[in-house]
């Protein structure tokens, strides 16, 4: 049985383990797109023909793949921008800096950290710093330097800031223009006083005139798209035994009961998925020799027959909800890459196998960097997608995805903001390496929110398409315990396959 543990890290992470049982509804918070671990606090393709899906509870069966991803290359992006640098430091115990969201910020990148902040947060429109009160009393300084890529139209009005801090000492904001090796100070603001009308947060609003940047031409960079084709994927769970379906904890069941090691059942699932425009399964994987590993081998062989793609969802967490240690992660990834990279059905991006990482933020980014460097040194390179919308992860990983988006407020705007920050991340790197933006869609989660006869699923698809994603992930094909499945079922028939096909045609037909 499968259990999940929910904790909040920057934006809440849905922690998965490799045993099986239903779980509580998670809480996600996505008001800010974080770039570093959060914690700073304040006091208070044109598709081919596809098989017809019926409107009954009987799932469609087709013997050949009928919906393949477009092979039309996506065009590169040519981007003009100005590079703005913010040096932000404090000798107080806490401070936050918010930028006006009306400013068209394309992306942001952490450059340096100074001192020893106990927590810090770096986002496209929000910075924050914390240090112990004892350090502040001793006058110690902590800070971050962050670069921003601004659209040229951002220069038409002053850039507005709101600076807050604790009662101790002060904070300093330096705004600079970066052109090649030339760094020029535009404005410096020091906030040292206690605001008597609001001494708890001591707010200071100020603005910076950027019109002087118009005297120089914006930088211009061409960014290639990270993938050559749009692909629609579904998270897939190969852990079911025949007797699982008798559990009273299930809210719904497949029309035909199955075991995850049944060849006929897997083939039927692939055919159903293809008829709905799905190009591949992201198969939950719990390590060498596990039941999910045994079934992965079978899934790959059957997928090859159907020209269907497969990759793994690397389960970073143990059954306890705690992350695996570095040595185990290294061992598992080494096995997965060396064992499966040669399989024709295993997805590859520019020749490198694709690995999707679950709960990546449960392991420090520095640890991931070390793991991936060791694997590359062994000749075991891959394309890795991190979990969550922590943009700083793109210094190590090749793209971002989220598993559960069911409770993210303002999903359309969140997708657009994260897509922009991900797609343009290379603007601020030494070389403009393209990063993969994945939008997630899902029909619901457990009892919340209400599926509303497919309306919720449609709404997440609409939000995803507006962000122009490289790929779309569906949560899920068959996670029955959490009631996120779109696989044909007793309650819904093939409704969700028909909705999936509708949006797949709309998206790939662009």
Provide a role label for each language-model segment.
Residues 74-141, 188-219:
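Glycan-recognition and processing domains
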Residues 214-510:
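Glycan-processing catalytic domains of CAZymes
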Residues 182-183, 187, 479:
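Residue-level signal for glycine
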Residues 115-123, 129-132, 149-170:
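Extracellular or exported targeting regions of proteins
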Residues 143-154, 202-215, 341-342, 348:
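Short, surface-exposed tryptophan/glycine-enriched loops
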Residues 1-83, 103-114, 169, 178-183, ...:
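Intrinsically disordered, low-complexity Ser/Thr/Pro-rich tracts
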Residues 80-90, 108, 142-146, 155-171:
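A short beta-strand element within beta-rich, extracytoplasmic domains
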Residues 174-176:
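Beta-strand signatures of extracellular beta-sandwich domains
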């Amino acid at each position: 049985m499968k259990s999940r543990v929910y904790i909040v890290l920057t934006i809440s992470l849905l922690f998965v383990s490799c045993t099986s049982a239903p779980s509580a509804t998670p809480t996600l918070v996505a008001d800010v797109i974080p770039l570093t671990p959060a914690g700073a606090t304040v006091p208070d393709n044109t598709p081919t023909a596809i098989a017809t899906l019926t409107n009954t509870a009987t799932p469609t069966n087709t013997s050949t793949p009928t919906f393949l991803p477009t092979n039309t290359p996506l065009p590169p992006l040519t981007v003009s921008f100005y590079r703005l640098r913010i040096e932000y430091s404090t000798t107080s115990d806490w401070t936050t800096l918010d930028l006006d969201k009306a400013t068209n910020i394309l992306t942001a990148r952490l450059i340096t950290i100074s001192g020893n902040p106990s927590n810090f947060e770096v986002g496209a429109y929000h910075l924050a710093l914390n240090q112990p009160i004892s350090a502040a009393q001793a006058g110690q300084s902590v800070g971050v330097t962050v670069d921003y890529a601004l659209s040229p139209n951002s220069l038409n009005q002053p850039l507005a800031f709101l600076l807050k801090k604790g009662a101790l000492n002060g904070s300093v904001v330096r705004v600079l223009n970066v052109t090649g090796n030339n760094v020029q100070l535009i404005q410096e603001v020091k906030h040292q006083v206690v605001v008597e009308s609001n001494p708890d947060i001591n707010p200071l609003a100020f603005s910076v005139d950027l019109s002087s940047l118009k005297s120089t031409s914006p930088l211009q960079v061409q960014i290639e798209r990270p993938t050559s084709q749009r692909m629609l994927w579904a998270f897939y769970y190969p852990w079911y035994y025949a007797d699982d379906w008798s559990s009273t904890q299930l809210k719904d069941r497949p029309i035909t009961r199955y075991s995850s090691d049944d060849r006929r059942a897997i083939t039927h699932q692939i055919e159903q998925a293809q008829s709905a425009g799905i190009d591949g399964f992201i198969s939950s994987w719990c390590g060498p020799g596990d039941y999910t590993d045994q079934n992965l081998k079978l899934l790959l062989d059957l997928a090859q027959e159907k020209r269907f793609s497969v990759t793994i969802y690397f389960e970073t967490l143990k059954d306890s909800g705690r992350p695996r240690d570095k040595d185990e992660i290294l061992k598992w990834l080494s096995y997965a890459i060396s064992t499966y990279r040669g399989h024709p059905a295993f997805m590859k991006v520019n020749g490198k196998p694709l690995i999707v990482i679950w709960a990546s933020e449960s392991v420090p980014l520095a640890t991931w960097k070390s793991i991936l460097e060791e694997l590359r040194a062994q000749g075991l390179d891959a394309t890795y997608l991190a979990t969550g919308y922590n943009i700083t992860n793109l210094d190590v990983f090749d793209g971002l995805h989220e598993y559960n988006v069911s409770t993210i407020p303002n999903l359309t705007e969140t997708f657009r903001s994260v897509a922009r920050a991900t797609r343009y991340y290379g603007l601020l790197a030494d070389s403009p390496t393209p990063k993969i933006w994945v939008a997630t869609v899902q029909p619901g989660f457990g009892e919340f929110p209400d599926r509303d006869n497919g309306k919720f699923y449609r709404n997440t698809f609409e939000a995803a398409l507006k962000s122009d994603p490289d790929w779309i992930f569906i949560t899920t094909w068959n996670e029955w315990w959490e009631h996120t499945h779109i696989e044909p079922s007793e309650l819904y028939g093939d409704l969700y396959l028909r909705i999936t096909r509708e949006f797949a045609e709309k998206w790939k037909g662009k």
